[in-house]
Regions:
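Short, low-complexity disordered leader/linker segments with a strong preference
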Residues: 1-37
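Extracytoplasmic "Venus flytrap"
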Residues: 36-58, 64, 74-83, 177, ...
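An alpha-beta-alpha
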Residues: 57, 145-192, 294-310
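Beta-alpha junction/loop-to-helix N-cap segments that form part of ligand/metal-binding clefts
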Residues: 75-135, 229-244, 248
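Flexible loop/hinge segments that line or gate small-molecule binding clefts
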Residues: 110, 117-153, 250-264
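Hydrophobic alpha-helical segments within soluble ligand-binding/sensing domains
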Residues: 128-167, 269-288
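Pocket-lining segment of extracytoplasmic ligand-binding domains
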Residues: 179-248, 254
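Flexible loop/turn connectors
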Residues: 257-308
Length: 333
């Protein structure tokens, strides 16, 4: 009899314990379901390419269910001011966001310097290793992962030679302050010089010197190439104005800049880069550790043409190039 009572007592206690565990799990799941996820986004500067990345990030989060009252997104823009990057990075960290996202290299660097605990998601960084954000793209060792959009340089040089076969000297316009630009410049020089092109670098410290530098360049080069460079992108209208006056084609690395007056690019869609960045963030938000989320490397692109610019510069687009290209701007009829 005593043994039966003991058994029933143990069964009763087990039921109570399991019930308590189940209740706790239900409460936790309920709390997780109702938790407001906090996402901090730091954008380096305002220009169309980065704006498209930011839009892609927000839309990508929405598609993953992070929308409405389920998410609080704080977007800060440093407008190219390095001191603001430091201040804003600390603000997003102090706000205890679940993840922080840096759009452009300086923004990602600022966030990575501000925290070693909160996951930092890179928003389309061309050279994360060179920028000292990660050491290993496949196995991020710290709290930083995200997307890396590596410019398809070899394809770009081939496009330059196809569209402007008589161009012998290519001028590269970039900002000396941007680490991400320097690696692209070195890569472009390697492929271009291998193909017999003469490459001349024109580095500017800020947007203030672009107009003067363009005046010098246009008398010495046959075509201009700009890397993924936020300083140049934010003053691209100045570049195009000077190039148009001199009747010199400008090759870019971004689809939005072809729409703004560049002749052509082997482009990566900036909006889709933003959505890829969101996918990396979602993996971390759903519980994956940063070290288990490899950097998403996007290194291909699609030839993108501005046929109106080609028309204005009397450049004939070969049929084989035309067939495989996206058209950003049509020619006048």
């Amino acid at each position: 009899m005593k043994n039966k009572r003991l058994i029933w007592t143990l069964v009763f206690l087990a039921i109570l314990t399991l019930g308590s565990i189940g209740t706790d799990l239900f409460k936790k799941e309920h709390q997780d379901a109702n938790k407001v996820v906090k996402v901090g986004i730091l954008q380096f500067v305002t220009h169309d390419a980065l704006d498209q990345i930011e839009k892609g990030i927000e839309d990508g989060l929405k598609e993953a269910g992070y929308k409405g009252d389920k998410v609080k997104i704080t977007l800060l823009n440093a407008e190219g001011d390095q001191s603001k990057i430091q201040t804003m990075s600390k603000q997003l960290v102090n706000d205890k966001n679940d993840v922080v996202i840096g759009i452009a290299t300086p923004a990602a660097q600022g966030l990575a310097a501000a925290t070693k605990d909160i996951p930092v998601i890179m928003g389309a960084i061309s050279d994360p290793v060179g920028a000292k954000l990660v050491k290993d793209l496949k196995h991020p060792e710290g709290n930083v992962t995200g997307t890396s959009n590596q410019v398809p340089i070899k394809q770009t040089v081939e496009l330059v030679k196809s569209l402007t076969p008589n161009a012998k000297t290519i001028g590269i316009l970039y900002a000396s302050s941007e680490d991400n630009s320097k690696s692209q410049v070195e890569s472009f020089k390697k492929y271009a010089e291998k193909d017999g092109l003469n490459v001349v670098e024109y580095a500017v410290p800020s947007t203030n010197e672009i107009n003067t530098t363009m005046s010098v360049m246009t008398g010495k080069v046959d075509a201009i190439w700009t890397p993924q460079d936020n300083t140049i992108a934010s003053a691209f209208s100045t570049v195009i104005s000077s190039a148009n006056q001199a009747k010199i084609p400008v090759y870019t690395t971004v689809d939005t800049m072809v729409k703004e007056g560049g002749l052509a690019s082997v482009a990566q869609n900036q909006y889709e880069l933003g959505k890829a960045t969101a996918r990396s963030a979602v993996k971390v938000l759903k519980g994956k550790k940063v070290k288990d989320v490899p950097v998403d490397v996007i290194d291909d692109g699609t030839p993108t043409l501005n046929l109106k610019v080609a028309q204005d510069l009397n450049i004939t687009i070969p049929d084989d190039v035309l067939k495989q290209s996206d058209i950003a701007v049509k020619a006048d009829k």
